[in-house]
Each structure stands twice: as C-alpha cells, then as structure tokens.
Amino acid sequence: MNEQSEKNNSIQERHTDHSFPEKNCQIGQKQLQQIERQLKCLAFRNPGPQVADFNPETRQQKKKARMSKMNEYFSTKYKIMRKYDKSGRLICNDADLCDCLEKNCLGCFYPCPKCNSNKCGPECRCNRRWVYDAIVTESGEVISTLPFNVPD
C-alpha cells in the first residue's frame, strides 16, 4: 500500500511540475504588462519649459548667489558685537569689571568653572556678548549700576 501511495504522490508531483511553469509564465507576463502600464502613467508626456530647460549647474549657481545675499544681509544687520574679550575684560575700555558692577571689587563670586576668575557671575565673562546694566533686588531697589558707558 505504501508503494501505491508513493507512486500516486510522484505522479501528482510530475503533473504539477508540468503545469506550474506555464502558470508562472502567465503570471510573469501579466506582472510585466502591469509594470509597463504603470511606467507609462509615470512618464512625462509634456514636461513644460521649466523641466525641459533644467540645468543643475545653473541652478546651483543661482542658489549660491541667493545664499550669499542672505548671509550678507543677516551678518551686517543682526551681528551682535562681543562686550568682553577672550580674557573677560570689557572691550570698550579694557576694564576688568566684576559682575557685581563695583569698580574696585577684586571678585566676589565663586571661581568660574571655565576661566577660574572670581569676577564672573553665573555665566563666564570670556567672549560674552552682553553686560549687566544694573543689580536690582526683587522689590525693585537698584543696588548698583554699570559704571561705564558700553556701546552697542
């Protein structure tokens, strides 16, 4: 009985082997036709003058020109000048002013983690772009003001 079932299985396998390539061929042709149709739909039929005259080199040149104009505009109008130099001294008069705004103060803050100066407040003075105008309490009382005129 096992021999008969093996023969039947082998006959069925042979039969399916013959019909299977034909089905594969039909499926493959249908898929190719679908792909060709989709590609035709995606192709430009009338791209217009902007796409037809497209040149990547001139586009890149125009982009560079626009970027340089934009950078020039922003660099001159909105450039914030530094108030302190690299060692933490005021650039306008080379004064070594403490952030407490007292002229004769030798430094009343903890040492700065960046420059080790006792004259830096919560933020290091080296290359800083702003100055303290005044020291004011929560009640609004002014304790000290900037002793120098610092230009913008």
UniProtKB/Swiss-Prot annotation:
Residues 1-21 are annotated as: Disordered. InterPro entries: ARF7EP_C (IPR029264), ARL14_effector (IPR053130). Transmembrane segments: none annotated. This is ARL14 effector protein-like. The lineage of its organism: Eukaryota, Metazoa, Chordata, Craniata, Vertebrata.
